[in-house]
A protein has these predicted regions:
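Bacterial N-terminal signal peptides
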Residues: 7-17
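Positively charged n-region of N-terminal signal peptides that target proteins for export
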Residues: 1-4
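Extracellular glycoside hydrolase catalytic/binding regions
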Residues: 29-30, 54, 58-75, 166-197, ...
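Structured loop/turn residues at beta-strand edges in well-structured enzyme cores
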Residues: 45, 93, 234
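N-terminal module-boundary/linker segments of secreted carbohydrate-active enzymes
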Residues: 20-51, 60
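An active-site-proximal structural segment forming one wall of the substrate-binding cleft
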Residues: 67-97, 102, 106-197, 218-231
Length: 382
């Protein structure tokens, strides 16, 4: 039963693939037309794939134990193998998008001490613009170019995660301005603007306006200047704009949208969000709650850049970002079954028809170690 249920996760991405008319292995430039992604022939395109990060720790030390020059080639070779696996249609893998985290393990200065204001990946005090420029040239863009060579569009996510509160005009906005200024000025990135897109931030929680208040205009005040900077630098590709509440709240954009062309919105979705779970499988209710929280789905393309699930099993669980208990599972952030929550999630995608997605890790799609040792692609968690 476990194998049958989890194989359905693998099959979900294949089913979503039927929406996109672009042949797999091809990446013609994409643009936004209304609330859809289109290719140059006017075909509607829906993307489906995975996210991952070039981190020794998060990659389970498979290519090395340090983020430094000596390990760049090994990291590139590792991801080239992953790209081969997730696009191997002969073995049933049909990914056509890769969300690339510009992991801070490369952009942080190892010789600089933290200021202690934030912890983990929300700590930007060790960020080095020089290191971002260096590893954009030697690692991040080569990773993106290899992905495109395998028929994958690429969504670039900035280094790290947002601290709990970010303010228009504040330090974190300036950090993102610096990151995307460097990236969008890069000649190679601009050259691939039809294949590479930008997700402005990862999981903002509380976003305040210039006065420090959570107002309907706060999201626009925070992200519009970053969009303007990217466009001023000549990057013409798609920009994915996040919401607040760990990317679950887009209500302010209904009144104060992001202005400009090639704009979409990047959303997160996990079991328990938008009124759906294994015990809440009313698809119509889930569609209504999603629309109430993400009204921009009517006017712009949406990409769910984090989503995962696997069934409950005995063992220790964890608390999620909302402080809610998540029972133990087979290796995902969220716990649910494909036959219950997954079916409801699929109905959401089918209803709107303009929602792309990336699973929250390559290891949520395929069994990485099995592929590396045998060359055989099989679904995760078997």
């Amino acid at each position: 039963m476990k194998q049958a249920i989890l194989s359905a996760i693998f099959g979900l991405c294949l089913t979503v693939g039927a929406w996109a008319q672009v042949p797999f292995g091809h990446t013609p430039p994409l643009h936004v037309d209304g609330n859809q992604l289109h290719d140059p022939q006017g075909n509607t395109v829906v993307l489906h794939g995975v996210m991952d990060t070039p981190s020794p720790y998060f990659n389970s030390w498979r290519w090395g134990n340090n983020a430094n020059d000596a390990h760049v080639d090994a990291c590139l070779q590792y991801f080239d193998k992953l790209y081969t696996a997730i696009t191997d249609t002969t073995q049933g893998a049909f990914a056509n998008v890769f969300r690339l985290h510009l992991d801070p393990c490369w952009t942080n200065d190892p010789d600089k001490k933290s200021d202690g204001k934030e912890s983990g990946e929300a700590d930007i005090s060790r960020f080095s613009a020089q290191r971002l420029e260096k590893y954009l040239r030697s690692l991040y863009f080569p990773l993106a170019r290899k992905a495109v060579g395998h028929g994958l569009y690429v969504v670039m996510r900035p280094p790290g995660v947002c601290p709990k509160t970010i303010q228009a005009g504040g330090e974190y906005q300036q950090y993102l301005m610096t990151v995307w200024d460097i990236v969008s000025r890069n000649d190679s990135v601009r050259k691939y603007a039809g294949q590479l897109s930008i997700e402005l931030a990862n999981e903002p929680v509380q976003v305040t306006d210039s006065t420090g208040q959570e107002t309907p205009q706060a999201l626009q005040q925070f992200f519009q200047p970053i969009v303007n900077k990217i466009r001023a630098n000549g990057f013409t590709g798609i920009i994915w704009v996040p919401g607040s509440g760990w990317q679950s709240n887009y209500r302010g954009y209904a009144t104060y949208p992001i202005r400009g062309y090639n704009i979409g919105y990047a959303v997160h979705d996990y079991p328990g969000w938008y009124g759906t779970s294994d015990s809440q499988t009313d698809a119509e209710n889930g569609i209504r709650q999603f629309h109430e929280a993400v009204p921009v789905v009517d006017t712009h393309p949406v990409i769910i850049t984090e989503v995962d699930w696997s069934p409950e099993k005995p063992g220790a669980g964890h608390y999620n970002e909302h402080g809610e208990w998540v029972p133990a599972n087979y290796g995902t952030w969220a716990t649910a079954s494909t036959s219950k929550w997954g079916k409801t999630y699929k109905q959401l995608l089918d209803h709107y028809g303009n929602i792309s997605m990336t699973l929250s890790g390559t290891g949520c799609y395929i069994d990485i170690d099995h592929y590396l040792s045998t060359g055989t692609v099989r679904p995760a968690f078997q």
